[in-house]
Amino acid sequence: MYQNGKPDAPTILGQKRELEDVEIQDDDIQEVSKEDLLKDVRVRSIQFDELESKIEGLQNLAEEKLKVLATLVSWWPEILQQFSVVFQGNELKDFESEGVFSILEKFPELSYFNDAVKNNKTKALSIIQKLLSTVDSSTNSVSRDPFSVLSIDDSALTEKLNTINLDIDKILDELDTTRSQLHSIIKLPDRSSSFTLQCINESVRPQSTKVKEEATTSSKGKDEEKKVSTVEQRTQLQQLSRLQDQQNGLMESRSQSLKILDSNVNEMDKLIMERENALNNVETTNLKKYSSFLALKEAVSMTSEQLRVLEHLLSECSHEINVLSQQSKNFNGVFESSYQPLINDLDHQISVMQNDEKRINNAKTELSLSLEKKLEAKKQKEKVYKDKLDELANLETMVLEKKKAVATREAANKIRLVDLNDLELQKDLSTYLSKELASTEKAFRLVKQQTVKSSHSHYQELITKFSVEKEKAEQKYFLTMKSTDSLHAEVKLLRQKYQKTNEIISKMLNSQDTAVHRIIEFEDQLARLSSVRNNSIKQSTTFQVKKSSQKSTIQNLEEKVSYLQQFMDKNNATLTDLEFQCSDLSSSIDILSKQDEEHEKEKRKLKDTGVSTSAEELKTFRAMCKCSVCNFERWKDRIISLCGHGFCYQCIQKRIETRQRRCPICGRGFGASDVIPIHL
């Protein structure tokens, strides 16, 4: 808050803002017109007084009703005992005697009730009858009390009166609080603006040298003389603004209290209107209930007719159900006699067909296995035949090679053989070899022909066997297929017939189920209609009972209407008193208007003298709040904490960057950490 025993920058700024707020309030006071305020005060004071008188009348009325109710509650057992003693064993004709009402005179607290009953004896007799019925009945005496309607309405009135009283207490508390606030505001000490000016001057004024301080002290005397006059003018303006604030607060509190009272009075008016509407609606409700009673009679007649129709439908449905049950029994007998053997034959044929199919499948598997074996044997023989052909080809190549070798040897022998013996030997050998070759060729060819013939004959035998077996299998297959087709056709026909029979049976069962459901529904409808009939009879009886009871309520409401008319007459009398009060208030308002005119004259004088000085001070304050280094272009937003002098951010930043870190006013050195930001 304070640095070196002097105020900190935020405190100075707060003081400046307080000064600006005071000036704005002064301008608002000058713009307000007193005539409008006086008009509002007059109107609202009149409304407030009217509502206060209305509330007092309502409170008195409520107190009277509560007294009557309290007396009735406290004395009703003794009253009932007296009535029961007087009227025991008497008929209704004796009730019309005037001696009956003498009982009420025994109780002085029931004078109000006695006056109300004397005007209409039939109503009193009905009330007495109901009281006697409550004495005789053992249970539910409170619900049959003839004064229940009145007690309910009075309870509602008491609740609303309590709420109105609470609202009035709240308004009075608010008025007390506003008065206490006004007294506290008036007693508060007025802080003059000279203190704030001193704080600002101290924050702006150089504090380094003693010479400058002495120069400022000499100028202080002159400034203080000027400021004393301005302070006196400002105190007067503040007093005027406070007076106007007090008036505004009082007016607002008055307006709020008047609004609350208006709402409460409107609620009471609504209650009265609702009571009057209730009287008008009773007859309409009776007419509506009579029409509903006629509608109930028509409904009962309609239900009786519907019961007859339903009984007729039940008889028809029972007849149809009997016919359907007989048809279903006949159908079951025909089905068992005609279709059952056919189904058994079909089952037998299907089993035979399944066995034949199994045999055919087994034969097919055996034939396929035998054919596979024969094909494998044929392949093996073909392999053996190919091997033998390869051996023959190899032998032929060997023979050709031997012949070539013999030819070469013979040529060599012809050239080289010298001796004849050798030649003869060679010739003998060649002839022998040629003979052996021819015999071997013949033998080989014979073996080859025999093997080919044997293999060919065996192959043809196998083919003939396979063709014969194939023809037999095909004949069997075609026969089985024909038999299966015929059996399938028969099975299809039988299945179609069976489906048709199932559909007929399902339809019969569905129709039987629907008939049963319809019978159940008709029985439920009969039970409902019987319950509706019983309820309608009960409603008709209750309606008659209510009709008889509502007659008494209508009579009570008529009494209330007469009472409300008396209440309105009393309110009209109170209006005359309020008019006299209004005349007194108008005279007081004239006196206040004269006082307001005098205040306005003083206000104008203060305005003429105080505006010029305040404008000059504003200029000086603005000059003080601007930076002197940059020729008052920017606002001061930084302060050097060592000396307390303020400058703009740009000027101090330039000095820090250029290392000229001395205050331009006092020349004291500072660092970057000594600079403190402020907000003006």
Swiss-Prot record:
Gene3D superfamilies: Zinc/RING finger domain, C3HC4 (zinc finger). The keyword Zinc applies. Residues 210-229 have a biased composition (Basic and acidic residues). The gene is brl2. The keyword Secreted does not apply. Residues 44-72, 261-288, 353-399, 485-609 form a coiled coil. SUPFAM superfamilies: RING/U-box. This is E3 ubiquitin-protein ligase brl2.
